[in-house]
């Protein structure tokens, strides 16, 4: 808000801005990053994960709590998430909310946060490994 005037932006504007700051990974590159030590974080809801499966070795952190889990000052942080130098690859269903979330993690100081272009849908379409969601 500048001078009391609200400048309206669309979600598409926010998404474009977020993605301009990310080096998004395709499915194969995301797998390679995971093998090299990147933390793959699945932000999808538990119901969707149960219905479609998960990326082996991924960590489930619902989008609704992701930023609190990643902020060491929040009182609700997850030790596995608060390494500001670690390569973090966020995964949502189709690669939209994960882009916005990755940009927010970058704003919090996670310089290597990015997302999976096309989300879990692209991972599955590429024929990469999927396993049942943990109970």
Question: Where do the language-model regions lie?
Answer:
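Rhodanese-like catalytic fold shared by cysteine-dependent sulfurtransferases
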Residues: 1-39, 46-87, 94-135
């Amino acid at each position: 808000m500048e001078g009391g005037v609200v400048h309206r932006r669309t979600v598409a504007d926010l998404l474009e801005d977020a993605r301009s700051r990310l080096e998004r990974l395709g499915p194969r590159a995301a797998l390679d990053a995971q093998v090299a030590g990147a933390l793959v974080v699945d932000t999808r809801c538990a119901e969707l994960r149960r219905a479609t499966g998960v990326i082996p070795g991924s960590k489930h952190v619902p989008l609704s709590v992701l930023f609190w889990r990643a902020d060491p000052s929040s009182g609700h942080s997850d030790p596995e998430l608060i390494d500001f130098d670690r390569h973090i690859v966020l995964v949502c269903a189709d690669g939209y909310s994960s882009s916005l979330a990755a940009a927010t993690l970058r704003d919090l100081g996670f310089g290597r946060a990015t997302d999976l272009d096309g989300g879990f849908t692209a991972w599955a379409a590429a024929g990469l490994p999927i396993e049942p969601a943990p109970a």
